[in-house]
């Protein structure tokens, strides 16, 4: 049995990784290990309990501290994470460590795996996301990784240009598409309890100056007024999100606004199925919403450089009128073409590749420059 340690560090990556986790668990030649870390341990959501309610968690790695925010705090958290992951890998002894994306939890785990001589597999490498500081970490993880599970053809080609051997690069689609067809709309009673929202706002911190983060949040909330009822989902733990959260709290008592905390993936998808538009700066606007046929209005620089379908409209400056106009255009629009992120089945493809009898990868990296 080949031991595969899957790293989850947040509510977002857990939802994306779930299909891969399930496929690994069902594979007869793979032994699943789950390591939960980082933002899962932070209040107020403390999403580690959500993970534990669904899966056996084999190790927990503390990284961030809830009372400290910012890039310096993140750097300290990475150091804490490298140490914690190294200890977990020593105890669990996985043959392969699997990470997704660009967050500091993935970067810390990738660093510990690479230095510790373990095979590293990376999902969603090669993507561009110039609007966040984590862009550099995504590409750093790519250079540490031995196996690459790219979400799009363009991302796969970018990984090859990094000098990674072609035999290690697999275009498998995005796991964000997996299972969408099986997730129904939110049930009517829950939808009614939340005011039957037709507009969803999901805005995360983008690592911008505090005044700019708050300005974006204020104009975003002002922009969705009049397109309600509105569901506003509280942000993740990215730098700057505390200023977004302050603006959301200030608007929480308004009668046409329903503020929601952590939503698991099926509930979030069920909410989107009722929505006319998703507004914000989450990658869900580019991937899940597009796959569901829900147009999106992307705000600010956070998703800059990422591949996107025609159903995503851009607002590059914090301007209420431009946001309002983009929402109206999105709701009225008929958008041609699909999206570049595949048609599902990504988790099964990843598990199949991990379970191949000859995993022809050496922990000693070889570039193809």
Question: What are the residue ranges of the model-derived segments?
Answer:
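A donor-sugar binding/catalytic signature common to diverse glycosyltransferases
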Residues: 99-100, 107, 122, 148, ...
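Active-site donor-binding acidic/aromatic loop of nucleotide-activated sugar
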Residues: 255-264
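C-terminal amphipathic helix plus adjacent low-complexity
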Residues: 329-369
């Amino acid at each position: 049995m080949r031991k595969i340690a899957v790293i989850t560090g947040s509510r977002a990556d857990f939802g994306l990784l779930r299909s891969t986790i399930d496929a690994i668990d069902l594979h007869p030649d793979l032994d699943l290990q789950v390591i939960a870390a980082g933002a899962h341990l932070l209040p107020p959501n403390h999403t580690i309990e959500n993970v534990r309610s669904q899966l056996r968690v084999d190790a927990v790695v503390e990284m961030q501290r809830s009372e400290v925010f910012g890039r310096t705090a993140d750097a300290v958290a990475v150091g804490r994470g490298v140490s914690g992951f190294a200890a977990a890998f020593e105890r669990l002894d996985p043959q392969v460590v699997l990470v997704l994306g660009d967050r500091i939890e993935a970067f810390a785990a990738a660093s510990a795996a690479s230095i510790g001589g373990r095979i590293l597999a990376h999902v969603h490498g090669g993507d561009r996301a110039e609007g966040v500081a984590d862009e550099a970490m995504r590409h750093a993880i790519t250079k540490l990784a031995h196996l690459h599970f790219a979400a799009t053809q363009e991302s796969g080609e970018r990984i090859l240009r990094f000098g990674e051997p072609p035999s290690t690069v697999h275009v498998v689609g995005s796991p964000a598409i997996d299972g969408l067809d099986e997730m129904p709309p939110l049930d009517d009673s829950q939808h009614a309890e939340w005011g039957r929202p037709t507009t969803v706002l999901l805005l995360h911190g983008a690592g911008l100056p505090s005044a700019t983060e708050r300005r974006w949040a204020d104009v975003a909330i002002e922009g969705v007024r009049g397109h309600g009822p509105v569901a506003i989902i509280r942000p993740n733990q990215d730098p700057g999100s505390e200023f977004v959260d302050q603006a959301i709290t200030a608007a929480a008592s308004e009668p046409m606004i329903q503020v929601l905390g952590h939503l698991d993936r099926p509930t979030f998808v069920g909410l989107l199925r009722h929505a006319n538009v998703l507004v914000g700066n989450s990658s869900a606007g580019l991937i899940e919403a597009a796959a569901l046929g829900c147009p999106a209005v992307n705000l600010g620089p956070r998703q800059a450089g990422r591949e996107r379908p025609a159903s995503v409209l851009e607002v590059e400056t914090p301007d209420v009128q431009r946001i309002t106009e983009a929402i109206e255009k999105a709701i009225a629009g008929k958008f041609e073409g699909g999206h570049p992120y595949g048609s599902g089945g990504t988790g099964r493809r990843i598990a199949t590749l991990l379970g191949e009898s000859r995993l022809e990868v050496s922990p000693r990296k070889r570039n193809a420059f």
